[in-house]
C-alpha cells in the first residue's frame, strides 16, 4: 500500500481533547487503511513510579486519598488506570468509523472485501478524509502517538 501521510506527536499528562488531520485523497481508492499507534498506556512497574507521585495523581484525578497501608488500592491504580485514545474518521463530512478497542496499534480498514469493526463502508473511497484522534486521558508526559494513512489507488 502507498503511504499517503504519517504524523507523530507527543501528549502531555492530563491532556484531554481532539486532534484532527485533514487530507484530500489523491484518487479514487480501492483500499484505505488508517492506523494509530501509541505507547505508555499503563504506568510502568511500581518501582519506576514514585509512590508520592502516584498518591498525588490518585487524589488529584479521582479524589482518592491513599494512606501508607493502602497497598491494594495503589496496586489497583497502578495496573488499572490507563491512557485512553480513540480514533475516528469521516469522509466527505460523513462518519465512516470510530475504534476504541484498548490496543496500542489499531487499524481502520475499508475495501470492497474488508471492513474493520466499528466502521461503515462508504459508497466510494475518494474525497476529503478527516482523521480525529480522540484523547480522553493521558497518564504520563511525553506519551507518543502516530497516525498514518495508506491507500491502494483504484485501477483505471
List where the protein language model places each region.
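Acidic, Ser/Thr/Pro
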Residues: 1-156
